[in-house]
């Protein structure tokens, strides 16, 4: 069972905001609630033999939501923004790779997913799979992956909490990510560049300029004739044109 599924089970069992599950490598797992200790063997440092590009560290955090359902699709964007802002405070080479991966220069170093559910209120489980070496350095935790999981989960909770306050102050609903869109724009390095729209099969559908992102999270591509093409995350990915 993956950490996201474990966290979902915890949430359905009444787990509260901030409870999390994390795993290091494919076989080591650790569940934690707040500051609870885990066994030393389950939280061992990542092996130096792990190859570049793999993301053997994963943490899934339960967040009880205080927003209405139309806002829920924004959660992974909110977390991506919060994590990226934190990372960019130390190094501006970090960015958001649409829709909500974290990149360092041209390399994706963290992937974010969110799964919503309802049990004693609306909740989301936010899972982050990442290169632990990059995050350990950014969060200044050496090779302590348990502490890293705790700090990442705290940042997830903080990011969602700040956004929820924005939602509560908003006078009307303008789209799930409308309230963070301006800040989100600033984190996406591919905006304005030539990109390929790539289907899940790997086929390139078109090459166009990455013109923007709408309030629903769609990428807006602009072709050579000035026509705007909306791309959803389910339909295709957007990558730099070669």
Regions found by a protein language model. Give the residues of each.
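Conserved catalytic/binding loops enriched for acidic/polar residues
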Residues: 1-43
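Long, positively charged amphipathic alpha-helical accessory segments at protein N-termini or as interdomain linkers
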Residues: 2-16, 65-94, 104-242
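Generic preference for hydrophobic/aromatic residues in regular secondary structure cores
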Residues: 20-32, 46-49, 139-141, 237-239
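Ordered hydrophobic segments in well-structured contexts
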Residues: 23, 60-62, 123-125
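Pocket-edge structural micro-motifs
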Residues: 26, 61, 223
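DPxDG-like acidic metal-binding loop motif
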Residues: 39-69, 75-79
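Short Gly/Ser/Thr- and Asp/Glu-enriched loop/turn motifs at secondary-structure junctions
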Residues: 97-100
């Amino acid at each position: 069972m993956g950490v996201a599924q474990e966290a979902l089970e915890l949430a359905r069992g009444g787990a509260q905001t901030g409870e999390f599950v994390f795993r290091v490598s494919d076989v080591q797992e650790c569940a934690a609630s707040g500051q609870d200790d885990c066994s030393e063997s389950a939280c061992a440092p990542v092996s130096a033999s792990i190859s570049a590009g793999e993301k053997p560290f994963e943490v899934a955090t339960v967040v009880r939501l205080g927003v209405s359902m139309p806002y829920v699709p924004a959660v992974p964007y909110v977390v991506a923004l919060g994590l990226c802002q934190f990372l960019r405070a130390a190094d501006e080479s970090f960015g958001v790779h649409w829709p909500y991966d974290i990149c360092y220069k041209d390399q994706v170093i963290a992937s974010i997913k969110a799964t919503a559910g309802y049990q004693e209120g609306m909740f989301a489980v936010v899972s982050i799979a990442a290169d632990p070496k990059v995050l350990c350095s950014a969060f200044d935790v050496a090779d302590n992956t348990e502490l890293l999981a705790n700090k990442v989960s705290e940042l997830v909770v903080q990011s969602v909490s700040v956004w929820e306050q924005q939602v509560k102050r908003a006078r009307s609903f303008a789209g799930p990510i409308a309230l963070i869109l301006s800040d989100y724009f600033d984190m996406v390095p591919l905006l304005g560049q030539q990109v390929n729209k790539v289907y899940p099969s790997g086929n390139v559908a078109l090459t166009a300029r990455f013109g923007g992102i709408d309030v629903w999270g769609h990428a807006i591509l602009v072709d050579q004739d000035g026509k705007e093409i909306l791309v959803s995350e389910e339909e295709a990915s957007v990558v730099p044109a070669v």
